[in-house]
Amino acid sequence: MGAEGLQGEGEVPPQGAGVPGQVQVGVHQEARHGESLQWGRAGPRPPSPSRDPRGLPVEAGGGGALRGQGQEPPRPGEKLLPRRGQGEAHRRGGTGLDFIATRDEVEALLLEANLIKAHRPLYNVLLKDDKHYPFLKLTNEPFPTLLVVRRVEEDGAKYYGPFPEAGALRRIKTLIDRLFPLRKNSGYPMKRRRYPCLNYSMGRCLAPCVGKADPEAYQEVVRQVEAVLEGRVDGLLQELEAKMREAARRLEFERAAEIRDQMEALRAFFSTDQQAFDPEMGDLDFLGMARSGALAVVQLYQVRSGRILGRISRVVEKEEATDEEILWAFLRDHYLEASPLPPLVLLPFPLEDLESLAELLKRRAGRKVELRVPKKGEKARLLELAERNARLALETELKLRERRGEHPALKALQDLLGLPARPWRLEGYDISHLQGQARVFSIAVFEGGRPKRQEYRRMRLKAGNDDYAAMEEGVFRRYTGSLKDLPLPDLLLIDGGVGQVRAAARALEKAGLRLPLVGLAKGEEVLVTPEGRELRLPLTHPALQLLIHLRDEAHQNGLRYHRKRRSEELFRVLQGIPGIGEKRRRLLLERYGGLRALKEAPLEELARLPGMSLEAARALKAALAEEEPA
């Protein structure tokens, strides 16, 4: 992050001290039971972002934020002033501050965001939907392609998003794939092919992978795609209309008809998918917020060329956080990744120390981004609209919670794991196999603390006898394959120990996701984290009982698959045996379930079964003896 240095532990920066032009980012450290929050730390520094009770970061903040919480740096031995509403928690929970010096407020803001994401400190505002939503990426190549990704990288590509709703992303991606002939099937970076694909034959690709695309014509398509993704549709429609008229003037009627169809598809999409405002309003974002007790909803609307392109909504559940802290956390997390940025952002109420955020937005956008709180006029009415919708979303959330009667263990689970909100959706993962073969990845889903069996899933794995590789493959495919559009869980539970948990963490990292993750080892019923921390709870603990139920459901989901396979295999074998008709097949399936158990059954036992004869039993044993071992 460009940090210039780290001050020694326990040192007290003198009043007004510091390197000129630098900003310090502080990290509160957790205290052992009974210790008070002091300047300087009694415990060892944590070796990693794990939740080590001897040195866990409990809060991260830039210099301005810490000044607001503690007023002035205290003298040696003085207690730090707690944040509003957190005095008792801080008195129980901290031993000191670490400082990292950065070059300016913008670097401090970036570092603060990264520290919060890495450590998820207890006293910072953590957004409920703090996950990597998908972006559309226009690659940085001579012949770019459009990809769906979950991580923004500094690679020169153009990113558009985030898209909180997978349906909206699919619709815009499908529209672009259908109307604009960007390459689609030649990989990233582009690989040369011998023959063009079917998209070229359908007129949906210019086939640069076989050298058929004219670079200038391809860049023209790229420019049009950028216009769609940035919401500049009106200008694009005018340009296409001029091209249509020019094609008709040259008597190129087929080309003119193609452009006409393209224009009609764009008009239909943007008239039904978006609400139109005044086109003179241009590009801007506006926000609304509503709150009831600990629960708050923040919503951001993106307006481009006078149309609402999308809405992003976040739920925060934190009793002690102020409205200003919640809004600041939303702005920080959203604008560190969102792209492209508008020239104007309308805020529902003033915030202190917005200069650093404005400077960060300026650097990201390459131009000034104004942060404004309008008091009257059309823009003030936009804020009223946003607040009204945020209030409706909050009321809906409260009614849903009341109606569904959340499981009491969810609050215990939130407190136990330090989650930002009650984990509504849980997913449990299990690896099972049939006699060392046919490994299966099983998914169980709980919502509100109760099984949602219609969303249980299973998948056959390619990994061999390596349980860790199997877990990594299963988790990666859950978030990148055919199941990627399912809702993201608030917590993952792995059936296994630290090895399986770390394999799952690697898969999440490869998929560009950051999700809370724990494992539950069999037998000892011990919770484990990717960092190797073990948490032993009494069997009567409600959170542990809920996780055991989830783990067992995932395991049973896998067993049901293997039982079904055994029955299918047995049915296949029985079909070809003389004297074994439908009734006898059904009897044997119900009694033995699988081929292995049937092979081990004695001849006399088979002959005594209702409806079986000695001759039929002998024919059955002879046929089973010829069957290859399972």
Swiss-Prot record:
Annotated ranges, domain GIY-YIG: 52-125
Pfam families associated with the record: HHH_5, UVR, UvrC_RNaseH, UvrC_RNaseH_dom
SUPFAM superfamilies for the chain: C-terminal UvrC-binding domain of UvrB, GIY-YIG endonuclease, RuvA domain 2-like
GO CC list: cytoplasm; excinuclease repair complex
Compositional bias segments (type: Low complexity): 9-28
Keyword GTP-binding on entry: no
Keywords: Cytoplasm, DNA damage, DNA excision, DNA repair, Excision nuclease, SOS response
Region (Disordered): 1-96
Location(s), subcellular: Cytoplasm
GO molecular function, one term: DNA binding
Chain ranges of the UVR domain: 234-269
BP-aspect Gene Ontology terms: nucleotide-excision repair; SOS response
HAMAP family from the UniProt entry: UvrC (MF_00203)
Similarity-based family: Belongs to the UvrC family.
Subunit structure: Interacts with UvrB in an incision complex.
NCBIfam families: uvrC
Full protein name: UvrABC system protein C
Organism the protein comes from: Thermus thermophilus (strain ATCC BAA-163 / DSM 7039 / HB27)
